[in-house]
């Protein structure tokens, strides 16, 4: 008697070529937790002690466009809610990976799919700006390394932007695949094992004949009648 899984494995258990997908998922969730925790602390300090954080012109990206804001406190409620939500679903994924609970990985996986779709739409829509990318950068006064980028050749700058978008999309797809493989690994691990008995052949004398063979078989002689003594 042997045991085998009731479902074959069609996923990889390696992440980044150096660790298990479960470990990689825990590291990814922990990273998101730390980033959003720091963001929540920064927003809390900005709201409770507005004089501590200096007033600066902050630019943040929302669906490919930059919007200027004089103070982060104006959008602190929305940003804090987003940070709290991201921290929660990241903590759920870490707990699910540690405790082997597949259901706890689904919220973060759905967020990854939504983020990937939005990123693809942003990348596709940004292709319309590529021929006029220098004009677009010239309208952003505080864009980092603006002068260095404007000094580059247009074709070279276009190539850099395309490579950046491609690597960005590939990275997001790889992280989605990592979480999905972890989901499949935990699901397969929680499946019950099925006992499989080896097949054996019955001896010929115990095998019933087919209908054709039974018809061709000669009839047996009837048993002698019973004669009382």
Swiss-Prot record:
It is found in: Endomembrane system. Keywords: Membrane, Transmembrane, Transmembrane helix, Transport. The keyword Cell membrane does not apply. The chain crosses the membrane at residues 25-45, 78-98, 104-124, 156-176. Belongs to the LAPTM4/LAPTM5 transporter family. The C-terminal domain is necessary for retention within intracellular membranes. This is Lysosomal-associated transmembrane protein 4A. The lineage of its organism: Eukaryota, Metazoa, Chordata, Craniata, Vertebrata. The gene is LAPTM4A.
């Amino acid at each position: 008697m042997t045991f085998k899984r009731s479902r074959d494995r069609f996923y990889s258990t390696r992440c980044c070529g150096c660790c298990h997908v479960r470990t990689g998922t825990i590291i990814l969730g922990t990273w998101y937790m730390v980033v959003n925790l720091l963001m929540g602390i920064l927003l809390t300090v900005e709201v409770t002690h507005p004089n501590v954080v200096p007033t600066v012109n902050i630019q943040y990206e929302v669906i490919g466009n930059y919007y200027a804001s004089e103070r982060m406190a104006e959008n602190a409620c929305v940003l804090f809610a987003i940070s709290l939500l991201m921290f929660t679903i990241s903590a759920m994924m870490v707990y699910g990976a540690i405790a082997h609970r597949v259901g706890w990985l689904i919220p973060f996986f759905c967020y990854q799919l939504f983020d990937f779709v939005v990123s693809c739409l942003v990348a596709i829509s940004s292709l319309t700006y590529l021929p006029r990318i220098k004009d677009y950068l010239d309208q952003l006064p505080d864009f980092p390394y603006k002068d260095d980028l404007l000094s580059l050749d247009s074709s070279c700058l276009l190539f850099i932007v395309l490579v950046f978008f491609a690597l960005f999309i590939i990275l997001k797809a790889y992280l989605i695949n990592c979480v999905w493989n972890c989901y499949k690994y935990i699901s397969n691990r929680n499946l019950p094992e099925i006992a499989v008995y080896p097949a054996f052949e019955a001896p010929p004398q115990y095998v019933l004949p087919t209908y054709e063979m039974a018809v061709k078989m000669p009839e047996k002689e009837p048993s002698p009648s019973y004669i009382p003594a």
